[in-house]
Amino acid sequence: MPEQGPRMNGFSLGELCWLFCCPPCPSRIAAKLAFLPPEPTYTVREMEAPAGTAQPPREEGSGEPAACSLHLSERADWQYSQRELDAVEVFRWRTERGSCLGCMFVRCSPGSRYTVLFSHGNAVDLGQMCSFYIGLGTRINCNIFSYDYSGYGVSSGKPSEKNLYADIEAAWHALRTRYGVTPENIILYGQSIGTVPTVDLASRYECAAVILHSPLMSGLRVAFPDTRKTYCFDAFPSIDKISKVTSPVLIIHGTEDEVIDFSHGLAMYERCPRAVEPLWVEGAGHNDIELYAQYLERLKQFISHELPNS
């Protein structure tokens, strides 16, 4: 999987003062600490209708034609053939806060019951993740739906905590409206910063399951590991929302995570009322859990044997 970004802690005293005192509000903390959008690795173009035919209808809420084509740059590190690329569906969808998001549907397993709504890390976009999605979906027998946060890839707007929550809300409704996938067939998967919108959405909607890959308790607890409570100026307070999640939750974390300490995964697990057996990957860091065999083994076990499949 592509690199998910540099360390979030280990700042100097001066840097920490700048982060949290100019002024100490969650949106500024979030923007300074968490969002590192790369230069876009893809473009989305409207597909022209054949001569003599009408333009395709516009999707309600998207503001864009239904049919678009995906064009990847060299930095996307595409690992498959044109046939797989042609099977990737892309479109744009508008959020309630006005951003127009790039969205992607990877039909890896047409006969599968489940679709994974994947919220990626803080330093990648859909172009970089596309190959990973195809490989993951094929191996766990699920289709993959993903989106770029505001200010990432082709998505308009700027990354912020409020936009993060609005973005996944829009993605949820796009998946349900455009593809007719019902909540009991949706698995929410968040990785790193992607666990933040995932927990927020899961605390408000019930779904088939939730997977939290290297989750964080809150922004302040990442920068200040000794923080024991959530302050009013903290950002991303997932630790206070996880108790409201009513769906089964699988938590995955590397014991040697150098970005979001392993203690975050443990704390989220202990606070979660519907947690299943977690996956603690001995020796894994923040960006290499997918390279360990037990990663796919645990996902397959969870989806194929611990969730309903009839």
Swiss-Prot record:
It is found in: Recycling endosome membrane; Cell projection, Dendritic spine; Postsynaptic density membrane. GO terms for molecular function: palmitoyl-(protein) hydrolase activity. Coiled coil: none annotated. Gene3D superfamilies: alpha/beta hydrolase. It is a lipid-anchor. The active site is at S192, D257, H286. Its EC number is 3.1.2.22. Palmitoylated on cysteine residues located in a cysteine cluster at the N-terminus which promotes membrane localization. Keywords: Cell membrane, Cell projection, Endosome, Hydrolase, Lipoprotein, Membrane, Palmitate, Postsynaptic cell membrane, Synapse. Pfam families: Hydrolase_4 (PF12146). GO terms for cellular component: dendritic spine; postsynaptic density membrane; recycling endosome membrane. Transmembrane segments: none annotated. The keyword DNA-binding does not apply. Belongs to the AB hydrolase superfamily. ABHD17 family. Hydrolyzes fatty acids from S-acylated cysteine residues in proteins. This is Alpha/beta hydrolase domain-containing protein 17C. It comes from Xenopus tropicalis (Western clawed frog).
